[in-house]
């Protein structure tokens, strides 16, 4: 269900702005998107896992808040991010 350290490092390298960037909204959204994707796959086999479903809704809400922040600050950056991650909006 959770992402591996190697995958998280790869996501950070892929979405960071500079060499020391690990916490920008883009990186956080990319990591949350990966976790959401993993949980969505989990529900294909465990449809009645309501405890995890609540966690999924929390992750989606957190990602939505970060995306709203990016959109408020820079619309072009927001559009590029959702296109790169394949998020529909």
Curated annotation (Swiss-Prot):
Q: Name one GO biological process term.
A: translation
Q: Residue ranges under compositional bias (Basic and acidic residues)?
A: 1-23
Give the CDD domains listed for this entry: Ribosomal_S15p_S13e
Q: Name one Pfam family in it.
A: Ribosomal_S15
Disulfide connectivity for this sequence is none
One function term, GO molecular function aspect? rRNA binding
Listed SMART domains: Ribosomal_S15
Q: How does it assemble?
A: Part of the 30S ribosomal subunit. Forms a bridge to the 50S subunit in the 70S ribosome, contacting the 23S rRNA.
Family stated for the protein in its record: Belongs to the universal ribosomal protein uS15 family.
- State the protein's name: Small ribosomal subunit protein uS15
């Amino acid at each position: 269900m959770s992402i591996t350290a190697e995958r998280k490092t790869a996501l950070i390298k892929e979405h960071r702005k500079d060499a020391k960037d690990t916490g920008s909204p883009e990186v956080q959204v990319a990591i949350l998107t990966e976790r959401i994707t993993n949980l969505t796959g989990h529900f294909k086999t465990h449809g009645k896992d309501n405890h995890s479903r609540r966690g999924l809704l929390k992750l989606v809400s957190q990602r939505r808040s970060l995306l709203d922040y990016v959109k408020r600050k820079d619309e072009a950056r927001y559009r590029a991010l959702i296109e790169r991650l394949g998020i529909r909006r």
